[in-house]
Amino acid sequence: MKKIRIGQGFDIHQLAAGRELVIGGVTIPYEKGLLGHSDADVLLHALCDALLGAAALGDIGKHFSDTDARYKDIDSRKLVCKVHRLLAETGYRVVNIDATIIAQAPKMAPHISGMIANIAQDLAMPAGNINIKAKTAEKLGAVGRGEGIVAEVVCLIANSDEGEAQP
């Protein structure tokens, strides 16, 4: 019997001077970047959590600790590729992804197609099965004041063969 599972991921990072802004593996020209142990790619971190959660494999912190020097300043696309391998090892493939980025600035719309292309490549899936939306916080809260950026991701995974997937 085919198994399907859903996953949900959330991440938030503070904006800080002196950092590159990388979201969805795309470097976005901006005066600030996201603060974190890795490249702080808020979208890809939420994606990793959604995929790991769907497969009952824990979360990003379990697999890629922010105290582990191996992950200092790592390109989060490498983390997505590692999560993809973990899913494959348990018999799952990604069916679709729906994501929302919440940022007061900069505008994300010009960069969304690049984000989708990166995720499709890293997860070996059709770009047409990935949707990314961008919203503002309507100037409310820390995100609305431009202090940080949030990403939320939901995903659907299914076992890729006729047998039972082993979580």
Curated annotation (Swiss-Prot):
NCBIfam families according to UniProt: ispF (TIGR00151)
Similarity-based family: Belongs to the IspF family.
Broadest EC class assigned to this enzyme: lyase
Residues involved in 4-CDP-2-C-methyl-D-erythritol 2-phosphate binding: 11-13, 37-38, 59-61, 64-68, 103-109, 145
Assembly: Homotrimer.
Protein name: 2-C-methyl-D-erythritol 2,4-cyclodiphosphate synthase
Keywords: Isoprene biosynthesis, Lyase, Metal-binding
EC identifiers of the protein: 4.6.1.12
UniProt xrefs under Gene3D superfamilies: 2-C-methyl-D-erythritol 2,4-cyclodiphosphate synthase
Single GO biological process annotation from the record: terpenoid biosynthetic process
PANTHER family, per database record: 2-C-METHYL-D-ERYTHRITOL 2,4-CYCLODIPHOSPHATE SYNTHASE, CHLOROPLASTIC (PTHR43181:SF1)
Function of the molecule: Involved in the biosynthesis of isopentenyl diphosphate (IPP) and dimethylallyl diphosphate (DMAPP), two major building blocks of isoprenoid compounds. Catalyzes the conversion of 4-diphosphocytidyl-2-C-methyl-D-erythritol 2-phosphate (CDP-ME2P) to 2-C-methyl-D-erythritol 2,4-cyclodiphosphate (ME-CPP) with a corresponding release of cytidine 5-monophosphate (CMP).
A GO molecular-function descriptor: metal ion binding
